[in-house]
A protein has these predicted regions:
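Active-site metal-binding loops of divalent metal-dependent hydrolases
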Residues: 10, 44, 226-227
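Mg2+-dependent phosphoryl-transfer enzymes with acidic/Ser/Thr/Gly-rich catalytic loops
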Residues: 1-5, 22, 195-284
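Active-site phosphate-binding/coordination module
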Residues: 23-128
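Short, hydrophobic/glycine-enriched beta-strand segments
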Residues: 4-9, 40-41
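Short, structured coil segments at secondary-structure junctions
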Residues: 57, 63, 71, 180-182, ...
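Conserved acidic, metal-coordinating active-site core of Asp-based
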Residues: 100, 107-224
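Short, well-ordered alpha-helix to beta-strand connector turns
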Residues: 3, 36, 64, 155-156, ...
Length: 284
């Protein structure tokens, strides 16, 4: 099998724990792109916030290179940040998700992602540091009133941050009980976030939509990730790859598990094995 596109999660996959990029990953990505390969960050973040990373990878402003943002809520071409597709939350549903989540604990902070902006309510100290390390632009807000929801740009997702797994599970339960599990896609990420998108919006379906637009079969697509919000794209891809630091559920889903973790060039390992050296999946 000849692979033509690699979709990659960012945090705890492509990026080191401190938010930087291993130079092995940078070199391998640039080498693959130089051969006509497509490297697509597939992230929960906004496409605006990944622009510094795209510059490091040599992808910023490139025609026929893409970013999938908001866990599949938007597909954007790097040239001119041309938005090809958005799949937004209904404003009323977004408001209900927010209200349900913050009721669980007074220490919870909440992120509201619109197509162009990130708003954060009750910003925590740990989240402030996390955002700073990754140069993610955001705007702090007070409690959002009805006008906020009705006048906002299209809302891509609502997420909640808390360091305790038990609290994150409570948030998940509270939101799903309130709005109904059929109304949203609910996932965990980065061992700190609980994320809610519109039903049917996840990284896997977005990968399929992009592949269709590019005339690719999913058998020609590789995907790599570490956490539960990556499961759908690993399942959808022709070759699903887990980094060594991935959670057990991801490792079980993946076709192959890398030797290296995110801090030691797992993405480069995958590219060198399956793209740059022309090794196909028959050797797994």
């Amino acid at each position: 099998m000849t692979y033509r596109m690699f979709v990659s999660d960012l945090d705890e996959t492509l990026l080191n724990d401190d938010g930087t990029v291993n130079q092995k990953n940078v070199a391998a990505i640039k080498a693959a792109v130089a051969q006509g390969f497509k490297f697509v960050p597939n992230t929960g973040r906004s496409f605006n916030s990944v622009q510094p990373l795209l510059e490091i990878l040599g992808l910023k402003g490139l025609k026929d290179q893409y970013v999938i943002s908001y866990n599949g809520g938007a597909i954007v071409e790097n040239a001119g940040n041309k938005v090809l597709l958005t799949r937004a939350l209904d404003p009323q549903l977004a408001s209900q998700i927010f209200e349900a989540g913050i009721q669980v604990n007074s220490e919870i902070d909440a992120h509201i992602y619109t197509v162009n902006h990130l708003f954060i309510y009750n910003l925590s100290v740990t989240d402030r540091r996390y955002m700073s390390e990754r140069a993610v632009p955001y705007q702090k807000i007070e409690y959002p009133n009805a006008d906020f929801w009705t006048n906002a740009e299209p809302i891509m997702k609502v997420i909640f941050e808390h360091p305790e797994p038990a609290v994150r599970e409570q948030i998940m339960t509270q939101v799903l009980t309130t709005v109904g599990s059929e109304a949203v896609e609910a996932t965990y990420s980065s061992s700190r976030y609980v994320e809610f998108n519109r039903a049917g919006v996840e990284k896997g379906s977005a990968t399929q939509l992009l592949a269709e637009q590019l005339g690719m079969d999913m058998s020609e697509v590789m995907a790599i990730g570490d956490n539960s919000n990556d499961l759908a794209m690993l399942e959808a891809a022709g070759l699903g790859i887990a980094v060594a630091n991935g959670i057990e559920e991801v490792k079980k889903m993946a076709n192959v598990v890398m030797k290296y973790d995110n801090n030691h060039g797992a993405v480069a390992e995958a590219l060198e094995k399956y793209v740059l050296k022309g090794v196909d999946d028959a050797s797994i």
